[in-house]
Amino acid sequence: MSVTTFCSLKKTDKCNIYISKRAFSVFLFYLFFFLFFHFYFLCSSSFAVIIHESEKRKNIMRRKRSILQIFENSIKSKEGKCNFTKRYITHYYNIPLKIKKHDLPSVIKYFSHKPNGKHNYVTNMITQKNRKSFLFFFFLYNKYFFGKQEQIRKMNYHEEMNKINIKNDGNRKIYMYPKNDIHEEDGDHKNDVEINQKRNEQNCKSFNDEKNENARDPNKILYLINPRGFCKGVSRAIETVEECLKLFKPPIYVKHKIVHNDIVCKKLEKEGAIFIEDLNDVPDGHILIYSAHGISPQIREIAKKKKLIEIDATCPLVNKVHVYVQMKAKENYDIILIGYKNHVEVIGTYNEAPHCTHIVENVNDVDKLNFPLNKKLFYVTQTTLSMDDCALIVQKLKNKFPHIETIPSGSICYATTNRQTALNKICTKCDLTIVVGSSSSSNAKKLVYSSQIRNVPAVLLNTVHDLDQQILKNVNKIALTSAASTPEQETQKFVNLLTNPPFNYTLQNFDGAHENVPKWKLPKNLLHMIKEREK
């Protein structure tokens, strides 16, 4: 119908106006477009992401900005209004959003209350990236305590139920709990006394934690050094023993301690591992695991005579040194082995070619070496030596024998190098160095030595019970690291001890070296046994 025709119609005339499907689709599109952006800009005024979690987990609304950033920005804002939350959360969740002023004590005591009267706003529920477990951010905008910005304590993401403490002028703590923890006044309570007691203990603990946090001396710093702890060779050796214990019935015999750490070895002994030094202690035909430190060819021959099932957990870096010693000995080289002659790793390497290998323990031993001018020389080192001492010995060897050769990539383990490098960067700024490790660990003792030669006191401790608190007097800055055979949980025990009363050190992570951890598989014959057992 044209405009002229429409205008010529009388009032009594009837006119039917039809809308095409295309026009109707366009209309719906623009309507949806308008509502979407209206919803988006309205959401931008709030401080959190609103997620509609229905029974089928549909219609999840997200914000591009980080949840934490939005949350923290809202806390910093002076107004602290939650317009969007009030409107939508009440509809999506059955969480009481209105609480009377005189009901606040009952909220603290975890009793029931009805959502009415003058109110505070409780904000929304948000989801983590995996969409499986949910966090609850609770924020109370209290008009009765208006005038001072609320202080929010960050939550622990790994707890199933999270809470936020809000401190007002009266230093009063108010705790809000998720939907499942809130009951109606006329409802039943499950173990009210136990629940109240548990909540009160948590509240007191949170209050004490914040009080201790405020009481920290900013000058007292605990530097937790990275990298630290297990190297790949150690973790591979431990995993080898654990897999054998799963695959076969205990006992499982291990030649020498699998790694030089008493805590690790005691744990494996409880599971059924037996550490031996003499192969006569192993029954014929039984399984024998070689430790991460390597083994000499003579031991392998004895094992074959006893028809033992050998599983070699030797660190691949130690095995690399063995291969070079064998190869150079066949090429008529004389081998100079830098290390400690009583160390199990050096014993294994030396016995690869005892007729042409010379052990050097210190700089003075270099003076005792005499070779013909045309003699081919090759040097290797114990993988856990101090870089400082080793550098001095190597320099003297090169000065005396300019034609001497070595492994292109070096002999010292990457983990030993990285842990010493990281410690050397920070220890000179500290008053004390604490190395977590066993007294039988060579690389642990070298970490202590590395700090001491830089005039920084250092102690080697196996457990937190070995710590003498007297040494912490007048100590403001501590460098904390651990040996390559030390479990991380032992280091964390020191962190927990030193960052809590009575010490109250402030924890700071220090990245002293970048570490590329190699990807080494378990011994081949063990992997084959595992596959056969699975079949």
Swiss-Prot record:
Thermal behaviour (record text): Optimum temperature is 50 degrees Celsius.
Binding site for dimethylallyl diphosphate: H260, H293, H343, S441, S442, N443, S485
Pathway: Isoprenoid biosynthesis; dimethylallyl diphosphate biosynthesis; dimethylallyl diphosphate from (2E)-4-hydroxy-3-methylbutenyl diphosphate: step 1/1; Isoprenoid biosynthesis; isopentenyl diphosphate biosynthesis via DXP pathway; isopentenyl diphosphate from 1-deoxy-D-xylulose 5-phosphate: step 6/6
Cofactor binding, note field: Was shown to bind 1 [3Fe-4S] cluster. However, it initially contains a [4Fe-4S] cluster which easily degrades into a [3Fe-4S] form in the presence of oxygen.
Coiled coil: none
Leader sequence residues: none
Active site positions, chain numbering: E345 (proton donor)
Binding positions for [4Fe-4S] cluster per the UniProt entry: C231, C315, C413
Residues given in the record as (2E)-4-hydroxy-3-methylbut-2-enyl diphosphate binding sites: H260, H293, H343, T383, S441, S442, N443, S485
EC code(s) of this entry: 1.17.7.4
Keyword Plastid: yes
Annotated keywords: 4Fe-4S, Apicoplast, Iron, Iron-sulfur, Isoprene biosynthesis, Metal-binding, Oxidoreductase, Plastid, Transit peptide
Entry GO CC: apicoplast
Family named by the database record: Belongs to the IspH family.
Binding partners and assembly: Interacts with Fd/ferredoxin.
Role description: Catalyzes the conversion of 1-hydroxy-2-methyl-2-(E)-butenyl 4-diphosphate (HMBPP) into a mixture of isopentenyl diphosphate (IPP) and dimethylallyl diphosphate (DMAPP). Acts in the terminal step of the DOXP/MEP pathway for isoprenoid precursor biosynthesis.
Protein name: 4-hydroxy-3-methylbut-2-enyl diphosphate reductase, apicoplast
